[in-house]
Amino acid sequence: QFTPTESQKFVFEYGKNNQVHTLTPGESLDAWTMRGNLKQPNSKRETHNSRSHWVAAWNAQGEILHPEIAVYQEKVIREVKSGKKDKYNHWDLNYESRKPEITNTIIDAKVTAFLPENVLTIGGQFQHAELRDDSATGKKTTETQSVSVKQKAVFIENEYAATDSLALTGGLRLDNHEIYGSYWNPRLYAVYNLTDNLTLKGGIAKAFRAPSIREVSPGFGTLTQGGASIMYGNRDLKPETSVTEEIGIIYNNDRGFSASATLFNTDFKNKLTSYDIGTKDPVTGLNTFIYDNVGEANIRGVELATQIPVNDKWRVSANYTFTDSRRESDDESLNGKSLKGEPLERTPRHAANAKLEWDYTQDITFYSSLNYTGKQIWAAQRNGAKVPRVRNGFTSMDIGLNYQILPDMLINFAVLNVTDRKSEDIDTIDGNWQVDEGRRYWANVRVSF
């Protein structure tokens, strides 16, 4: 950080992260996978993820105006090594040919004006995303290609203090996508302090999500289904649009106790999917898959959360979410049957977690957490079965510690899924589709300067 004057600040940041995720048969994943009646040994897989980023930002604080501008860029590269044991019982791993590389650049600018009974914000954003990856050009050959897309937005938002207890916020955002054109997205929110400890808040917002670069590039073919098929992007895709309403109530006191309940409802359309169009690709001779928009859907539910200070050193936090999701149109089918009324894929009806924290000293905190994910149903067109597949719920436990070893250095260590709990074996007939991660160890060092 650089502060040339009391009212101005320049911020510069650079970071680089490298992560290796290893899945070993018989340890962090099942040794075998059942595909129908066929038992197949799993391969060992190492995923190397490299992420670098930089930030340059400036802000100023005047008596009325607070301007800000920031430029962000991140580059993510993924490399995968996989293989099976050789005749000497040693793992023979080789890098796969694909090496996806994504570069995201974002420029944000806004100015906030603190006016009598109003806080007005006006701003804009520019995004540029570029993807370099393999694209199939022949049955056994690939070629590295590069595609990019730009997106711009301007927005205005105003928070109005209607009374000492009521604040109203209204906003309007105009998104302009290089492919999809312009979309208006309004937002309205209200916060009402019923008492000093009890707050009621709620609102409604419209949003849209554009498909990824790969999904909208018709000349970009990616092998799928183990190389048996090829999937092309679709320039005619529409972005997913949604309208969300929520209302919640929050209680907190000066002793650190808090509790909240929130009801939410989201309706969206143009859900993104992919499927086999039933023809052979003229270039590769493989089965052809395509991305498309289908159907309307609804997600609604309730979220409950609380934080309880037991004493000065112990505290408990917990939350629970009930989610009811369903498809509301009959333009999706599985094995000739409409999926209308089926839940959205991989969306658990029940999810909960609880965490216990203990401040052993001022600098060391131990914690333990329980995490529950309920039963999930995968009823999509490409679920690998002829009927909706069911994945049973399961509970896992994590333990860890945070250690402020120096004023500017924080160490985090955790054992995830400490009991090595797993849901169930893969069953492509009508059951589980996901291999669970076993016990993992995680460590992080954060240095501030």
Residue ranges and their predicted role:
Residues T5-P67, Q73-I102:
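Flexible loop and strand-edge segments within Gram-negative outer membrane beta-barrel domains
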Residues K16-V20, G62-I64, Q73-I77, L115-E117, ...:
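Transmembrane beta-strands of outer-membrane beta-barrel pores
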Residues T5-S7, E13, E117, Q145-K269, ...:
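Structural signature of Gram-negative outer-membrane beta-barrels, strongest in the C-terminal barrel
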Residues Q1-F2, A56-A60, I107-A113, V154-Y160, ...:
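Residues on the lipid-exposed face of transmembrane beta-strands in outer-membrane beta-barrel proteins
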